[in-house]
Amino acid sequence: MDGARRMQTEMPLPDLIEIVPLTSAPKVEVTVPGSKSITNRALILAALADGEVTLDGALWSEDTQVMVEALQKLGYRIEVQPDPGESGNRTIRVTGLGQAVPSGGTEGQPLELFVGNAGTAARFLTAFLCLGRGVYRLKGVTRMHERPQAALLQALRELGYRIDSGNDRLPLTIHAGGPINGRCRVSIEESSQFASALLLAAKAGGWQVGIDGEKGAASPYVAMTSSLIEAFPNQGGRFMIEPDASGGSYFWAAGHILSDDGTAPVSVARWPDSGWQIDAEFPGRLPLPESMSRRDDLGDSIMTAIAIAPLAKRQSEFTELGRLRLQECERVEALRTELTKCGASIEESGDTLTVKPSALRGAEVETYEDHRMAMCFATLGLKVPGIRIKNPACVRKTFPTFFQKLATPVPYGLGATLRDGDGNDLKPEQLFDY
């Protein structure tokens, strides 16, 4: 069974889940799994380390599993153990091989690696594999084959590597070895992951990387990568991965929309304070300001803010959303379409969405195979009656325990009632399975 099919059958969630609103906000501190962004960066750095690295608090989800499986297929020794403190995490032990990335295949029989719809795995492995020898082929699911890769491929070709792709997207074939040059520049207008991919491998490759577009090296996820490289135990040791701030935003948002007095009865344990995750700023953005930028204020959690904006007391404007169009789905259009279906007054102009206070109603929400669409609208359903989430299993990408967290009784969850499409109540243990 290939990686795509296997991961689609590991989460036996119903085709549709209805969220029953809570009548009040529970006073609870929940845990959320580790940061996806940090976990997949740490896996690459651990593979390049001179010695064994133990990653504590690592996220265990589709995106991180495809990275682990790709590294294992390359020949890395990786041990995965349960995390007693968080069911969505694992302790991952990686035996690094320094700069000796295992060799690939041949021109006629390249070593093939599957990356699903994980942008981090697709971009990071593309640069990482250039450090090896031989021929590698990367492929993913259909949506990953539609997502941009051109700026990264251009930079790697500038370094002297041969990468074959019919349209500068996946699937692609990497002919490792080289480089001829030691300098390149990369544009991050479409994705900052292009720069992060190059920076993670730059020391081993002897590359000097210039970054163009947006805020350059100061762009939040690029800055995260640089900070992580500096802090990482590259001679071996232990590294603690902090909780995922994007995933935590749903619980801060839930507490906010359920609270009548502006307090924050729902909080997230071990909330990140390293400054690495821009979405750790989310609690400070509540109540929502009049204007918010995806580039300057929030990352993926700006989707959470947009989803709850119709419940705000004043109009909210969300700007510089262009990158959302190039991710798991066309997120700007998806948010506008599904919020409108729920009764929201929302206007799209260029890469800006303007959301007005609205009386919302229940609806059957398309998720577009996008984990964040499912989680955003499930959060909204904790307040708005009749929200029904189609294809809820898409949360397996980054937060497989999400619906279980909603349904688990206080103090370990929110204690919400979730139902299947036939109106049957779902138990927490029915909402999560690897």
Task: Describe the residue ranges of each PLM region.
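Structural preference for solvent-exposed beta-strand-turn elements
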Residues: 2-434
